[in-house]
């Protein structure tokens, strides 16, 4: 490598590190009781999402297509420029045999949209299927065939600033590999299966043509793992997912149903064998545990810079054993609940049991179980969330993809609890050049008053203002610029007659 190349490579690496270190917009959500811990006379109200009237917005394909059996968003939606991009799991057969997709393969399929509602499945021309390449299957190449066969949840991470163009898209997915294919083997914890669920990582320059990373699964040498998440938070990449006893257990060593665990890597190459206990539903940790309550497949996650927000599967066992001849999980029901994490490792549910996206009423297309994806986009004044339906009876009924929407970042809001008293909160400290609020319900005779505080909660002279109008991004106009580089906090006051609802605070660096 000549000196010019070395300098260019170093510059790219430095630029990449600066991109990673650069603080983007921070969000203090109304349901974040770490960043909005100090409250007086306030209550939190969560808001269920509204399902699109034309659901499902992405349907399975015709006979002979790779998604004729199902099209499920065990996958990812991102927006690049003006285009929405979706990676989802297809299945070409219309029948599940022995509890698995044919050949332990559900192809990584791809779709595009200009509005997030109307989707096309482009002919990528990359993978031979049913006698031709006119399909929307993404290409995955690797040394071992069994490592290229996606069979469950695929998570896509887009990092356009990566200095290596071939790594600007990253993926983690579940493959079911024969033990003899796994270099390094697996741990002796748990029960040995015919095939083992492993974490496969891959990289791509365009999100369509993928190369498997390395010659072994990321969890080689460890336990089976159903990976269902991939993100970068701080200095590490994280994969999150699901595990169950005997491969995992509650913190005291006792038997656990499905719980969420996390692994990490500093470079997307070497992954920890040690893992963190990321989340379990409250009923799973009491003694005795709540019967039938589990969390399903980790969480569909959204990295907002300073916090992770997500939706997790609220699994409830069937009331009775399945009738003879039915699937083992016949009667299982799943809704989607809200999660948040301030460290990218440990997650909590702001209001345990609240359903942000509930399954539909009996007879609706999504009436059995709801599946989450990494599929959140803020578009204008709304938040768009895509999800899919799971037929736990294994008949593949309506296993397609739907859309739900909220007010922009409108998962929940703070408002006064008692009508005849004022209210306020104080945030954690931060640095910012601009502050704005996501708020509604403000009236001319009841504006919100905002006051900057120093790190000792003392008011700062010249930094008081009133919010007199609603808006999803209502800027606070102080009489002078915010103090550069100083740790400050924000006090927001609701007068006695206020009907205001505050959804979020935005802090621009």
Regions found by a protein language model. Give the residues of each.
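Bacterial N-terminal signal peptides
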Residues: 8-17
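Carbohydrate-active catalytic/glycan-binding domains of CAZyme proteins
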Residues: 22-509
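N-terminal secretory signal peptides that target proteins for export/translocation
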Residues: 1-4
């Amino acid at each position: 490598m000549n000196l010019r190349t070395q300098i260019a490579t170093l510059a790219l690496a430095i630029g990449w590190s600066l991109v990673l270190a650069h603080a983007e917009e921070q969000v203090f959500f109304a349901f974040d009781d770490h960043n909005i811990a100090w409250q007086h006379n306030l209550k939190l109200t969560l808001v269920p999402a509204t399902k699109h009237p034309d659901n499902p917005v992405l349907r399975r394909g015709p006979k002979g297509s790779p998604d004729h059996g199902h099209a499920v968003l065990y996958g990812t939606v991102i927006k690049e420029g003006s285009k929405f991009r979706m990676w989802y799991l297809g299945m070409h057969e219309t029948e599940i045999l022995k509890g698995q997709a044919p050949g332990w393969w559900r192809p990584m399929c791809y779709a595009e949209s200009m509005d997030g509602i109307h989707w096309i499945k482009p002919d990528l021309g990359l993978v031979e299927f049913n006698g031709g390449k006119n399909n929307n299957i993404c290409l995955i190449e690797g040394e071992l065939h069994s490592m290229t066969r996606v069979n469950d949840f695929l998570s896509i991470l887009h990092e356009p600033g990566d200095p290596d163009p071939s790594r600007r898209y990253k993926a983690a997915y579940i493959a079911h590999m024969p033990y003899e294919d796994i270099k390094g083997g697996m741990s002796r914890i748990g029960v040995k299966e015919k095939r083992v669920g492993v974490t496969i990582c891959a990289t791509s320059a365009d999100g369509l043509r993928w190369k498997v990373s390395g010659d072994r699964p990321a969890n080689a040498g460890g336990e089976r793992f159903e990976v269902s998440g991939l993100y970068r938070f701080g200095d590490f990449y994280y994969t999150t997912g699901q595990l169950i006893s005997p491969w995992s257990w509650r913190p005291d060593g006792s038997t656990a149903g499905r719980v969420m665990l996390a692994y990490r890597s500093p470079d997307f190459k070497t992954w920890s064998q040690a893992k963190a206990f990321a989340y379990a539903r409250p009923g799973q940790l009491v003694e005795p545990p709540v019967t039938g309550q589990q969390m399903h497949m980790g969480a569909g996650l959204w990295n907002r810079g300073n916090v992770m927000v997500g939706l997790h599967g609220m699994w409830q066992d069937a009331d009775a054993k399945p009738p003879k001849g039915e699937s083992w999980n016949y009667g299982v029901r799943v809704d989607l609940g809200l999660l948040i994490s301030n460290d990218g490792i440990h997650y909590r549910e702001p209001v345990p049991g609240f359903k942000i996206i509930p399954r539909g009423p009996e007879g609706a297309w999504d009436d059995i179980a709801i599946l989450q994806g990494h599929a959140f986009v803020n578009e204008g004044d709304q938040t768009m969330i895509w999800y899919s339906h799971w037929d736990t009876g294994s008949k593949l009924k309506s296993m397609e993809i739907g859309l739900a929407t909220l007010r922009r970042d409108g998962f929940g809001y703070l408002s006064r609890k008692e009508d005849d008293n004022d209210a306020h909160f104080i945030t954690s400290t931060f640095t910012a050049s601009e502050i704005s609020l996501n708020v509604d319900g403000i009236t001319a005779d009841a504006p919100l008053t905002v006051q900057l505080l120093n790190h000792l909660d003392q008011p700062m002279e010249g930094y008081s203002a009133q919010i007199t109008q609603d808006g999803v991004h209502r800027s606070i106009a102080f009489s002078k610029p915010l103090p550069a580089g100083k740790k400050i906090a924000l006090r927001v006051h609701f007068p006695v007659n206020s009907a205001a609802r505050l959804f979020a605070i935005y802090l621009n660096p």
